[in-house]
């Protein structure tokens, strides 16, 4: 999968799905599934937005997009120049000149162009003019509510992981840096790994969780404690202390 973080990309007759894609949840995946039906290279356009908290970090989003069969992830920085474009400039420069879009798939609430002046009707009119088809998909509802990143953040933040996973479509996951700890667990013959997630990552409440951990292509079951280490002086950084079953290394 190609990962592009600027407009220096040249597609060729692509199927383009556009969205924020924080979490790439089940609603987002409807766009991806529709794009696959076009039998063309799939470009997923996402926008780099400074969020206080995100479901998935840029690296995690890349790994999930690749897993879902995306051919190119195009991350567009929302610069002042980019945001000042008219809807037609957006369609011409990004969808036509950069992606060479044959088809574009968006959600029903899609807005684009300066001041969010363009909507799905605008996009369909521009598609007719510029030569690409447009498919607009309704919002996915589960449990009587729209599936959204905001809803999933709330579920994770309150520890309702099974419900969050149902909306995500795959189990919530995280990546992080493994650091050498105080090795207190090793003295009790229960060595653990200390994993520190990105500071912007949405995390569940502090507590003990059952986990799966992938290590060098192999998956292990384990348990982890999420939180700080109040009994150890100077340890106040939030992290995961993970113990894996049947692991040595």
Where are these regions (language model features)?
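Short acidic-hydrophobic, aromatic-tinged amphipathic segments that line or gate anion-handling sites
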Residues: 1-8, 74
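N-terminal catalytic cores of NTP/NDP-binding nucleotidyl/phosphoryl-transfer enzymes
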Residues: 7-63
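Phosphate/ribose-recognition catalytic cores of enzymes acting on nucleotide-derived substrates
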Residues: 13, 181-249
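Short beta-strands and strand-loop turn motifs
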Residues: 15-18, 44-47, 74-77, 103-108, ...
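Residue-level signal for inorganic ion chemistry
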Residues: 25, 65, 104, 164, ...
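Acidic-and-aromatic substrate-binding clefts and catalytic sites of carbohydrate-active enzymes
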Residues: 52-53, 82-84
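A glycine-rich helix N-cap at a beta->alpha junction
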Residues: 61-77
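Classical nucleotidyltransferase
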Residues: 84-191, 206
């Amino acid at each position: 999968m190609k990962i592009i973080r600027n407009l220096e990309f040249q597609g060729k007759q692509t199927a383009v799905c556009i969205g924020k894609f924080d979490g790439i949840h089940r609603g987002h995946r409807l766009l991806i599934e529709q794009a696959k039906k076009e039998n063309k290279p799939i470009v997923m356009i996402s926008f780099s937005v400074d969020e206080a908290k995100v479901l998935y970090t840029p690296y995690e989003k890349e790994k999930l997009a690749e897993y879902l069969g995306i051919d190119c992830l195009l991350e567009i920085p929302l610069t002042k120049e980019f945001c000042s474009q008219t809807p037609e400039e957006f369609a011409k420069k990004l969808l036509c000149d950069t992606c060479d879009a044959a088809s574009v798939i968006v959600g029903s609430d899609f807005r684009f162009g300066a001041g969010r002046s363009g909507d799905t009707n605008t996009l369909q009119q521009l598609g007719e003019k510029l030569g690409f088809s447009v498919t607009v998909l309704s919002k996915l509802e589960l449990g009587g509510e729209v599936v959204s990143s905001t809803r999933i953040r709330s579920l994770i933040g309150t520890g309702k992981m099974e419900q969050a996973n149902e909306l995500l479509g795959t189990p919530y996951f995280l990546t992080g840096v493994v650091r050498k700890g105080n090795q207190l667990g090793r003295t009790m013959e229960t060595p653990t790994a200390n994993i520190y997630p990105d500071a912007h990552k949405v995390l569940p409440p502090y507590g003990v969780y059952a986990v799966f951990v992938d290590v060098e292509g192999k998956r292990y079951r384990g348990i982890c404690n999420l939180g700080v280490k109040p009994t150890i002086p100077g340890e106040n950084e939030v992290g995961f202390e993970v113990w894996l079953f049947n692991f040595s290394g």
